[in-house]
Structures are given as structure tokens and as C-alpha cells.
């Protein structure tokens, strides 16, 4: 993830394309509230602005809020459903919240009670400065997108429903808070560094397990764990039936070069046979989403390092695959899945709209008449359809009793793939997408595991992945 930790000052007065309207606000005694004179308001009204944008100028009050056609647009760095108050990104780290939010809102005279136009939630990072940086970068991008939309349509998007805010207003009222932050965040890192001086550093090592699920009645602790090959780990399982046997396609990550390949495991009579690597590129591959259509077998592995979404076709099952189509190019995408419904193809993928490389927060949906198209269209309701690190990132797809279920990864504070949710897709069309959470799975079904983020199933077999912390990858 790229974080803009260095801020660059720009002198706007040197920009000849900008016009300036100088106004001087009046601060309250507390230096928190800012109001403008009637003369200033009259000048602003005369200028006929579409909207005004507040950039950290204190809390605005009075007629300034009504002086432009569409009002005043403002950032709020924080999820106002969870916490209120600043500094940006601080309280989520201190309180170990799994996600950190921002809203872009139209201001009114009620503190934190503006009309929410855009809301986003990102995985909380481990340190305040990085968490703050990602919130600023992501919200900045979506503010620009909002302003472009306002410029084109000359109206604000539909705001969220009215919500009452009863949560605590946080303030740093003493140095005790900062000592608590240092104790919680720096001390554990210092201790881990000391251990790393005498022991190999801790790594997260994923594994895969499988079982005949018996109509999804078998408990996950009964699933058979497949030992990892030496110096590697297996993750992102996808189950596929071919003939009378089931196969599990997995990410096969080699620690020796920090790169994933796609490998396959044959399951027959509940016994496994590791068949080895079946697809490798000169960039990382993972998440081997496999499916069939018109008697052909296809795979869309994640190829985010190559900035594209690729469709491979099977020439000889299970070990011979060729690149068939580039579905999208020049895109920062992860964990792509497709399926055919109501005579259309739908793509669910995790795209980072900004330059952060964050694939945890945004779920995008695209539609196409043809599978082998490089002109997939976003659904008309707009992307992302979900903007929340607790619900967005794909972890699998399966079908049961005519219902399509999407697995999503659930991330904790600085904890990728902590658990996963199971969601029933209620509506998907070229115009809308909706789903509802039906279950959550926590990482407690195998001894010593700390994470689980992928699940796949057909009518016969199911597979799940999970991770443990280890101080050696050579085993």
C-alpha cells in the first residue's frame, strides 16, 4: 500500500486558471466556530457557486451554509456511526476498531449531523500516521469523483436516510491518551523486534482443508487438513468437479521468491493427491476462480501485480491452461469472480479506485453480454456497490438450492483475512446489487489458527483455508 506521508504545499495564487474571492471569517472565542459577515455572504451569493468545499476551516455556522446553490461539502474523517471527534484516524487505532471510516457530507447547523453523500470504511492500519494517510488519500479521490458528478448533473446525489448520532464525542484532553497510544502500539512492536533478533520473524502461513460436506452439515473442525509443501503455503481454495472426482485449485505460494502459482489437488474417495503447479507466470497469481461454460473450463486467477483481469481456458484438464482473453487492462483489481444469470454475465471484483493499492474496501460489479469481452460495463447504480472492509473483499462463491452465495473476507485492525462472512445475493442486474449476511465464520475451528478468509463448495465437496502464525517457513 502506498501512503502519502509527505504533504506538498501548493500556492494557488500562481494558478492563472483560478479566480479568487477574498472573504474574512470571524472566529468564536473558543476558536472552533467560524462565521462570515453579511457583506461576505452577499459576495458569495452573487458569484453563483454550485457548491462550496470546506477544507479544515473550523466548524462553519450561519448563512454561509446556504450561500451556494447546493450548499457546503465537507470531509469527516471518522465513521460517525461509531465515533465522533478527531484527530483523523487516531481513535480507531487506539480503540482497536477493525475499520476506519470517512464521510463526505453536505453541512448543516447540526454538528456531525450533515447529509451523508459518500461513506467509506477501510481496514484500520496499525499506526496512527499510516491510518490517517490512507483515509485522507481515499477520501480525497472520492471527493474529486463527487465534484465531477456534481459538475455534470448540477445536483447532489441522494443522501443517506436520517440517522441520530448518540455516540461519544472523542477529544484528546490529556497526555494520558497519548501515553496509552504509545503503550498499546509501540511497546508490542518493540518486544517483537527483540524476539526477532534471536528467533526467525513471525510469518502468517496459510493452509487448506476439505471434506464431503453432506449438505453443508459437517463442522469445519472435521475437515481434513492438507499439509503444506516444504517452503510454501496453500490458500484460496476453489472446488471443481470433473468426471467422478473433485479437484481443489489453490494459490501455491513459494517463500523462496515471494510469488504465488496455481496448483491443483485431486480428491478421490476422500483421499487427496497433490498434483502440483499447473499455472505459473512471471508475476504473482492467486485466487484461482474456476468455472465451466458451454462445455469449456475457464479460470480467472488474481493477477493484480500485472494490472489486469485474465481469463484462462483449459486445454487439457487439469494441468494445461492458456490465456484466452484479457477482460480488463490497466486496473488495480483483486479476487475476481464471474457468473451467468438472466442471460448476462456479472463480474464481482475488488478494485482500488485511488492509488493506495487497497483491495479490502471496495466491491465493484460489472456486466457484459459476453464472457470474452474487454468492455465490461459498471452497473448503473454506480461502483463501489459496497465500500466497507468488513464486507467487500471476495472470498469465494457457491450455489445452493438455487441461491447464489458470496463469501466475503472480514478484516480486523491491521489483520488481513481475520474471518469471513456468507452472504445471500438477493438482487443483481445491470442496474442494482444487494445482498444480506446470513452467517459469519471465525478462526476457531482448528488448533492455533488466527485467520480464515476463503471457502468454496460444489454439491459434493467443500474446502476452507486458514492461517497460523509461525516462525519458520522452511518446514
Predicted regions and their residues:
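Short glycine/acidic-enriched loop and turn motifs that connect beta-strands
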Residues: 253-257, 304-307, 352-356, 411-415
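Recurrent small/Gly-Pro-centered beta-turn motifs in extracellular repeat architectures
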Residues: 250-252, 301-302, 349-351, 408-410, ...
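Repeat-solenoid scaffold signature
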Residues: 386-419
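Blade-level signature of beta-propeller repeat domains, shared across WD40, Kelch, NHL, RCC1
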Residues: 418-428, 435, 445-475
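Short loop/turn segments immediately following beta-strands, especially the blade-tip
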Residues: 314-318, 368-374, 424-435
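Beta-propeller fold detector
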Residues: 223-224, 274-279, 322-328, 376-384, ...
Amino acid at each position: 500500500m502506498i501512503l502519502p506521508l509527505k504533504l506538498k504545499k501548493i500556492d494557488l495564487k500562481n494558478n492563472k486558471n483560478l479566480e479568487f474571492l477574498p472573504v474574512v471569517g470571524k472566529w468564536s472565542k473558543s476558536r472552533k466556530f467560524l462565521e462570515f459577515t453579511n457583506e461576505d455572504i452577499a459576495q458569495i451569493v452573487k458569484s453563483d457557486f454550485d457548491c462550496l468545499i470546506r477544507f479544515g476551516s473550523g466548524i462553519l455556522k450561519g448563512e454561509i451554509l446556504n450561500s451556494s446553490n447546493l450548499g457546503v461539502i465537507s470531509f469527516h474523517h471518522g465513521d460517525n456511526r461509531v465515533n465522533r471527534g478527531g484527530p483523523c484516524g487516531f481513535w480507531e487505532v487506539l480503540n482497536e476498531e477493525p475499520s476506519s471510516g470517512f464521510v463526505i457530507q453536505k453541512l448543516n447547523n447540526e454538528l456531525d449531523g450533515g447529509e451523508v453523500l459518500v461513506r467509506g470504511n477501510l481496514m484500520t492500519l496499525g499506526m496512527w500516521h499510516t491510518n490517517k494517510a490512507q483515509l485522507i488519500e481515499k477520501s480525497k479521490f472520492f471527493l474529486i469523483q463527487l465534484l465531477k458528478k456534481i459538475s455534470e448533473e448540477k445536483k447532489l446525489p441522494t443522501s443517506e436516510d436520517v440517522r441520530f448520532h448518540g455516540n461519544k464525542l472523542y477529544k484528546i484532553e490529556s497526555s494520558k491518551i497519548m501515553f496509552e497510544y504509545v503503550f498499546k502500539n509501540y511497546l508490542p512492536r518493540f518486544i517483537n523486534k527483540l524476539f526477532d533478533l534471536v528467533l526467525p520473524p513471525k510469518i502468517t502461513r496459510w493452509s487448506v482443508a476439505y471434506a464431503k460436506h453432506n449438505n453443508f452439515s459437517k463442522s469445519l473442525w472435521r475437515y481434513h487438513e492438507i499439509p503444506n509443501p516444504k517452503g510454501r503455503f496453500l490458500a484460496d481454495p476453489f472446488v471443481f468437479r470433473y468426471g467422478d472426482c473433485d479437484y481443489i485449485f489453490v494459490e501455491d505460494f513459494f517463500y523462496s521468491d515471494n510469488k504465488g502459482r496455481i496448483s491443483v489437488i485431486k480428491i478421490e474417495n476422500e483421499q487427496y493427491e497433490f498434483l502440483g503447479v499447473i499455472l505459473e507466470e512471471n508475476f504473482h497469481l492467486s485466487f484461482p476462480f474456476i468455472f465451466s461454460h458451454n462445455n469449456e473450463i475457464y479460470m480467472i486467477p488474481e493477477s493484480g501485480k500485472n494490472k489486469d483481469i485474465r481469463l484462462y481456458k483449459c486445454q487439457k484438464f487439469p494441468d494445461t491452461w492458456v490465456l484466452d482473453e484479457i477482460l480488463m487492462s490497466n486496473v488495480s483489481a483483486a479476487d475476481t469472480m464471474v457468473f451467468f444469470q438472466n442471460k448476462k454475465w456479472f463480474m464481482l471484483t475488488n478494485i482500488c479506485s485511488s492509488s493506495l493499492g487497497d483491495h479490502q474496501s471496495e466491491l465493484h460489479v460489472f456486466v457484459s453480454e459476453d464472457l470474452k469481452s474487454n468492455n465490461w460495463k459498471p452497473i448503473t447504480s454506480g461502483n463501489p456497490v459496497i465500500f466497507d472492509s468488513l464486507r467487500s473483499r471476495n472470498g469465494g462463491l457457491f450455489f445452493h438450492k438455487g441461491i447464489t452465495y458470496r463469501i466475503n473476507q472480514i478484516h480486523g485492525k491491521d489483520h488481513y483475512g481475520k474471518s469471513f462472512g456468507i452472504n445471500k445475493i438477493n438482487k443483481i442486474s445491470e442496474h442494482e446489487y444487494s445482498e444480506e449476511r446470513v452467517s459469519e465464520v471465525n478462526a476457531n475451528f482448528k488448533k492455533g489458527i488466527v485467520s480464515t478468509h476463503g471457502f468454496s463448495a460444489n454439491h459434493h465437496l467443500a474446502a476452507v483455508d486458514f492461517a497460523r502464525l509461525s516462525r519458520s517457513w522452511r518446514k
